[in-house]
Design a protein with these regions (language model features):
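Eukaryote-biased recognition of intrinsically disordered, low-complexity regulatory segments
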Residues: 2-22
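Short strand-turn-strand beta-turns centered on an Asx-Gly dipeptide
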Residues: 10, 64-67
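Short, contiguous acidic and Ser/Thr-rich linear segments
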Residues: 19-31
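Active-site phosphate-binding and catalytic loops of NTP-dependent enzymes
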Residues: 44-50
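DNA-contacting interfaces and partner/effector-binding or oligomerization modules
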Residues: 50, 60-64
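A generic structural motif
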Residues: 76-77
């Protein structure tokens, strides 16, 4: 038999809700998701929890545990002090559907706004060799499991509620991956500045801190994009050189997510 743990779980829907107290058994080696499953099985059969792989790879079980955005399947009970109460609440940035399940469809709409990868048609299959630095950079960005913890913790979305103006850190690294690809020909910098709100990010690195895949979102993704925007639109020397040499990429404005 394990020890009893004080578990506070947010119960409710979009209209109203509150924290409900439970005493749940916890065994050695378990994670918070194990306790939620035990709670469903023994005390709260109607508790709504989104989960899938229980291996930290699907991003489904995102929630806030003691106020910090985490994956429930990767948060071990051993990280808490003995007797410490555990509070589990839904992601605060997104609308609640029921209990711990939130509506993250905002992110899907944002993804549809991004112009897709546009390869150079003049380069045939197998004619270009990727450099290792480009491979490594892309591999880091592609580790994203779309848990949206970074979107949840971003204060531009969470506190200032700038969902219409700022695309969020998850999609800033998606844009960085496209913009830094050596074969991509689309010019998204104006859209990154005007439509996706790169200027709103003040690089507090809170998104990097909560990423379960340890992607260096701020330093390797957002800051390089912001630097490219500055070089393009605010550096007079770079502007002069571009005027002499001409642009290599075709402008790619943001897309209509409802189209």
């Amino acid at each position: 038999m394990g020890e009893k743990v004080a578990l506070q779980v947010w119960r409710g829907d979009a209209g109203q809700g509150r924290l409900t107290d439970y005493q749940v058994e916890a065994n050695e080696g378990e994670v918070v998701l194990d306790l939620l499953h035990r709670l469903q099985a023994t005390q709260a059969g109607d508790l709504a929890v989104r989960w899938n792989c229980k291996a930290g790879k699907c991003g489904s079980c995102s929630m806030e545990i003691n106020g910090r955005p985490r994956l429930a399947c990767m948060t071990r009970m051993s990280t808490f002090e003995p007797g410490e109460p555990i509070t589990v609440t839904p992601l605060r940035t997104f609308p609640v559907i029921r209990d711990l399940v939130t509506d993250v469809s905002f992110n899907y709409a944002k993804a549809r706004q991004i112009p897709s990868f546009t390869p150079d048609p003049s380069i045939g299959l197998g004619e270009f060799r990727m450099q290792q630095v480009d491979v490594q950079r892309s591999q880091e960005f592609r580790k994203c499991i779309e848990c949206y913890l970074c979107q949840d913790v971003c204060h531009i979305l969470r506190d200032q509620q700038k969902q219409d103006e700022f695309i969020g850190p998850r999609f800033m690294i998606f844009l960085a991956n496209l913009d830094m690809h050596p074969l991509d020909t689309a010019d998204r910098l104006r859209a990154i500045r005007d439509d996706f709100g790169s200027g709103y990010c003040n690089i507090t690195k809170c998104c990097t801190d909560v990423c379960p895949e340890h992607i260096n979102i701020t330093d390797n993704g957002i800051i390089p994009l912001k630097e490219r925007v500055v070089d393009r639109f605010y550096d007079p020397i770079a502007r002069l050189l571009r005027g002499i040499g001409g642009g290599k990429k075709e402008p790619a404005p943001a897309l209509d997510p409802d189209a």
